[in-house]
Design a protein with these regions (language model features):
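Conserved beta-strand-loop-beta-strand element in the redox core of flavoprotein oxidoreductases
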Residues: 184-208
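Active-site substrate-recognition segment that forms the wall
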Residues: 24-29, 56, 86-94, 209, ...
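Dinucleotide-binding Rossmann-like beta1-alpha1 core, especially the glycine-rich loop
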Residues: 52-135, 273
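N-terminal Rossmann-like FAD-binding beta1-loop-alpha1 element of flavoenzymes
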Residues: 8-35
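Glycine-rich FAD pyrophosphate-binding loop
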Residues: 28-48
Length: 414
């Protein structure tokens, strides 16, 4: 198959946000695109599938401006996509990071300083202890705590967004194959091939399909297709609870932003990483923990364990007095696909010339979805910039995994 960069035939493996946004951008630039998803869309087992993912820029400290620029660009694209969706999926109640220290070199201070120096944005406020008590009385604030409040921040209804985006790209001509698991990838000098097992065929035989290029955006299942990369990624179990209460009126968007509580010790290391959302469409409040969970197989049972359930209940009752008599209506687990340094992988697979990898969301990838699609497509068309270089593999996969993020504060995706 002769490679014509003006119009290529490209397969995208995985219909999470990395895969669908890439398919959207490729189709918009005139390429022929097919998306293969091992389950339904949205896949209940995928990292992208949940009720909510935070949109925030106050978590990247002074690492560099790559992430801040990308999330601000992504926010504009989310709004553009939303205008084409049937349902509203983007909400901006603000974001709030609460911590116990605000001095130079502490994560909270450096996040604030970086954004002020680079954005000069009036939406970003520092709330002292008294202001925190007054502004958010539904939260029990400790006497040593202070916060960054960013009115710009918010969240995406992630599972709904994935569904809406799949409908949109399908209407534009992208071929979508649900319940079609890719079992293998091959390359020749002229083409790339997928071996696909489809439930719809009621057969154990594999179908071989030919493409110019393949984009592997299979998240936690990257190892199954590209073991030399996937074996370097850790898949961790992350847990959350959903809460009903007679006091839900105190937790609506107008009264409570997306929040996280990130106390640090004397070594500037995070002690705990709880976060949550205001009242969601489903009528519940979501509370979760962003500390890296246990490493699991992506196909394993994800039921929250008793220890998490107790810790979440204790945290909720301590920090949200109005929820003391509330009911936990459900609990669930999801997965993060973590790189050693928590930065994404957007690069050609090692030893491959026609297989590209978009993976390693590391618990903060969803918000960047629209920008990821553009970055991937730019590389496939040989139009690279600074951001593309930031996510190359290089020697990153040989590093030791971080227990906690070096991006600044933990960055809730849910």
């Amino acid at each position: 198959m002769t490679l014509n960069k003006q119009k290529m035939k490209i397969a995208v493996v995985g219909a999470g946000i990395f895969g669908l946004s890439t398919a959207y951008e490729l189709q918009n630039r005139g390429h022929s695109v097919s998306v293969f998803e091992k389950g339904i869309i949205p896949n209940p087992m995928a990292s992208s599938t949940d009720v909510s993912k935070a949109i925030r820029r106050t978590s990247y400290a002074s690492n560099n401006n790559v992430y801040v620029n990308l999330v601000e660009q992504s926010a504009l694209k989310w709004k553009e996509w939303e205008s084409k969706f049937t349902n509203k999926i983007y909400h901006q109640p603000g974001t709030l990071i609460i911590s116990n220290q605000f001095e130079p070199k502490t994560p909270l201070y450096e996040s604030w300083r970086f954004l002020k120096e680079n954005d000069q944005n009036e939406d970003i406020l520092i709330l002292d202890n008294a202001e925190l008590h007054t502004t958010f009385p539904q939260i029990k604030i400790n006497n040593d705590e202070i916060a960054i409040y960013d009115k710009w921040g918010g969240y995406i209804e992630s599972g709904l967004a994935v569904k809406e985006l799949s409908i949109l790209i399908k209407s534009k001509g992208v071929q979508i194959y649900e319940n079609s698991e890719v079992k293998g990838i091959e390359e020749s000098n002229e083409s790339a091939y997928l071996y696909i097992e489809s439930d719809q065929r009621h057969s154990s035989s594999l179908t071989k399909m030919e493409f110019d290029l393949i984009v592997v955006a299979s998240g936690a299942w990257t190892n199954a297709l590209l073991p030399n990369i996937g074996s370097k990624l850790t898949v961790t179990l992350q847990q959350m609870i959903f809460v009903d209460s007679s006091n839900l009126s105190s937790f609506v968007h107008e009264k409570l932003p997306v929040w996280s509580m990130n106390p640090i010790d004397s070594k500037n290391e995070l002690i705990s990483e709880w976060y949550g959302f205001p009242l969601l469409r489903e009528g519940y409040i979501k509370i979760a923990n962003d500390s890296r969970g246990q490493i699991i197989d992506p196909n394993a049972d994800r039921s929250p364990n008793k220890e998490f359930f107790k810790n979440a209940t204790d945290f909720m009752q301590e920090r949200f007095p109005l929820l003391v008599e509330s009911q936990i209506v459900s609990a669930k687990g999801c997965v993060y696909t973590n790189t050693p340094d928590d930065h994404f992988i957007l690069d050609w697979a090692p030893t491959c010339s026609r297989t590209f990898v978009a993976s390693g969301g590391s618990g903060h990838g969803f918000k960047f979805g629209p920008s990821i699609g553009k970055l991937v497509t730019d590389v496939l068309e040989h139009k690279e910039d600074e951001a593309n270089g930031f996510f190359k593999i290089k020697n990153r996969l040989n590093q030791t995994h971080n227990n906690d993020s070096e991006r600044g504060f933990a960055i809730p995706s849910h």
